Amino acid sequence: MLRVLLFLVVLVGAALAAAAFVPLKIVIEFAHLGKIGFTTSGTEGTAWEGRIYDAHLGKIALGDIETHAVPAELLKGRLRIDMTGTDPGTQLSGGFSLGWGGIGIDALNLTASVPGEGPVPSGTVFVEGLTARFPGTYCGTAGGNARAYIPSPLAGVVPAGSMTGPAMCRDGALTFDLASDTGEARQEIEINATGGYSMRATIKPRNALIAAGLSSKGFTPGPDGYVYQTERRL
């Protein structure tokens, strides 16, 4: 029995090691990154070392990306591709992986501009140390943090500033649960496996006049405050 298990371990390790020399384009396709809106004008090299040209995550421009495999992850039954962005504006680093436990995001750091939607103004999102696993098409585990800087007042009520919070899995979706420093506003951003996402902004009005103003901007009353919700694609 021990010999059989050892043989299987060696067999899987050899298969993953061989996978490191598969063309990078095929690895990206196998990881189904296109489903979440990841596109590129071209690639060169293999999973071991390569380059991705003019990458985009939906409407977010990532620029050119240098990639390389992480040998230590092969011993864990996973093929991990680390990425380093060449665009200083995105500060992209981290990677993605596949193998035991499904497809994953590994220690991802990213800065991206996010367009506004209705009463929610545009801003900049800073993702820090995002790690997640997707067994199948749902989010199984997630960790890391996100910070959103909003340069203008949220719904004309909450002062400009930052909202911060953790990354987590909620109802099978990768979720960022952000809150303002004052606690009067929250934003929940849920990203699904097909590249769609929902954004839910909740504001606790301080008085009836503010509540009326929120209603006029599309917010609806709820148990935790006034809520504005929308669904979009990356």
Task: Go through each PLM region and give its residues.
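Beta-propeller and related beta-repeat scaffolds in trafficking/envelope systems
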Residues: L62-A72, V125-V127, T137-L174, A212-R233
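Short, well-ordered strand-loop elements centered on a beta-strand within folded domains, enriched
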Residues: L75-T84, W100-A107, G140-A146, T175-D177, ...
